[in-house]
């Protein structure tokens, strides 16, 4: 997949879909708080000076020096739950992100959040 230690270097990389179509630029990576595995990325989409951040899954993703390729298609990614470019993910928004991609969502054993940004 990729070396987790290099994630900070990815910010600003173009994110492309499984067919090479550009989705947007990588903004941040969200980790599963239980496993510490990178789980979702936020990708900036929309016009410069505006736009929003959509969540795309990192399972099956591949990184190269020029881009991050995810396994979802561009339309599915752009229709994904989003936050404003200055926004924060609320705990109540986590189930919708997982559900959009058909992934199971479970809160932690003590009710803690599932996703944390780095």
What residues fall within each predicted segment?
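Peripheral interaction segments used for macromolecular assembly
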Residues: 1-118
